[in-house]
A protein has these predicted regions:
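Alpha-helical transmembrane segments and immediately membrane-proximal extracytoplasmic
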Residues: 1-408
Length: 408
């Protein structure tokens, strides 16, 4: 052994760790601030659209044409969104265009303003990944900045939802299913917690629900129902992922011109969104989530209609994420299943909220942690069991088609 050589190696490792920690801290602050702006504007837009749905929804086709023009005029590659992020994380792509950040924010705001059914979390993840990857390349971090890219994804997720534990594991497990990027754990944790604290300090509120009931896993009937629910939630997430991929392919083949695709198809989309209880299925789906956890009115078909409208909205070129609609789909389905089975509907809604998301994104630890961060740890074992079953039956499908699979 050479003590001086070992000491040099230790110093090099300490310097590298310090640079990652400092970078993650700075990126967490920046991404958390952007998340706060993006999230607060989106909430304002949601309230404004809800109050003026009759006036705004007829302009959905024109809004779609505007989104296509923005991407084609400024950076068409950026329209690939999460696919670019995944490819960069897997080393298949050298860079992510910085234009993605303003384009995806503007496109998502426009989509929601005029009534499209879409989410927001995927947008935040793209923002975090793009900014962190550009930072890593600018300062010549190793491995094409992959570690900081994962940290940025965690910051984007954690900053918008303020579920930092779940955000860390989502970023670590989503790029390559079945393989955890443990080398990114420390930077991802620092970036995620910093972004969460920053966005909260800037006025973005966390969604959380205190469940008053706890499921007993010692009761055979309850366990049987939970296994059945896990299967149904897993199949629902799988259905969403498969339909999203197939409908995108179909629309691209039938209407190759993006202007015609979004212009023509969004006309009947707007009509049906309006006929669906005056825009009940527009936007994020937070209205359905609120109904599920306040004991409000939910219909047996809410989950499937929200699923179909979201798939169609995203398949023709509108912008926005998938995660919040997945939460609303799962919560709506879980509430109905719980009511039918005689189990606490709100607890079952929470299980659906997490498990459908986990199935559709082909992740396991992230949805379990979301359940405990949003709804409390009291039903932690139930979240674990249901999310595990959903993960196992989803058939390795994922809404992010560029996700790599290391097993199955």
């Amino acid at each position: 052994m050479n003590p001086s050589h070992d000491l040099q190696g230790l110093k090099k490792k300490a310097k590298e760790t310090f640079l990652y920690v400092l970078s993650a801290l700075l990126l967490g602050i920046a991404i958390g601030a952007i998340d706060a702006v993006f999230g607060r504007v989106l909430l304002f837009i949601t309230d404004f659209r809800s109050a003026h749905i009759v006036v705004l929804l007829p302009f959905l086709p024109l809004a779609g044409l505007g989104i296509v023009w923005l991407y084609r005029h400024f950076n068409e590659t950026a329209a690939k969104g999460m696919t670019i992020v995944m490819e960069a994380g897997q080393g298949k792509r050298e860079s992510i265009p910085l234009a993605l950040i303003p384009l995806v924010m503007a496109g998502t705001w426009i989509t929601h303003l005029f009534g499209g059914s879409a989410g927001r979390e995927g947008v935040a993840v793209q923002i975090g990944a793009t900014l962190s990857h550009a930072f890593a390349r600018r300062f010549h971090f190793p491995d094409n900045g992959r570690i900081l890219l994962i940290a940025g994804m965690a910051a984007g997720f954690g900053g918008l939802f303020q579920t930092p534990f779940a955000a860390v594991f989502f970023a670590m497990e989503v790029v390559v299913s079945g393989s955890m990027a443990y080398s990114a754990l420390l930077p991802a944790a620092i970036a995620s917690f910093t972004a969460s604290a920053t966005s909260h300090a800037l006025g973005l509120e966390k969604f959380s629900v205190l469940l008053s009931q706890t499921l007993s896993l010692t009761d055979t009937k309850t366990v049987t129902y939970l296994i059945l629910f896990g299967i149904l939630f897993g199949l629902t997430g799988r259905l969403f992922a498969v339909l999203l991929q197939k409908v995108k392919q179909f629309m691209g083949n039938v209407l190759e011109n993006p202007y015609k695709r979004i212009g023509f198809v969004s006309i009947p989309l707007a009509v049906f969104l309006f006929l669906g209880w005056n825009g009940r299925y527009c936007g994020l789906g937070t209205n359905l989530i609120a109904q599920a956890f306040s004991g409000g009115e939910l219909y047996m078909f809410d989950w499937i209609l929200k699923l179909l409208f979201t798939v169609l909205t995203l398949s023709i070129g509108f912008q926005g994420g998938e995660v919040t609609p997945l939460f609303s789909i799962g919560a709506s389905l879980g509430f109905v299943l719980g009511s039918l089975a005689g189990l606490p509907p709100m607890v079952c809604a929470a299980l659906g909220y997490t498990a459908v998301f986990g199935s559709a994104t082909n992740t396991f630890l992230a949805p379990v942690l979301i359940g405990m961060e949003v709804f409390g740890v009291e039903n932690g074992l139930a979240f674990f069991a249901v999310c595990l079953v959903a993960f196992l039956v989803n058939g390795n499908r994922c809404i992010y088609t560029a996700q790599k699979r290391s097993f199955w």
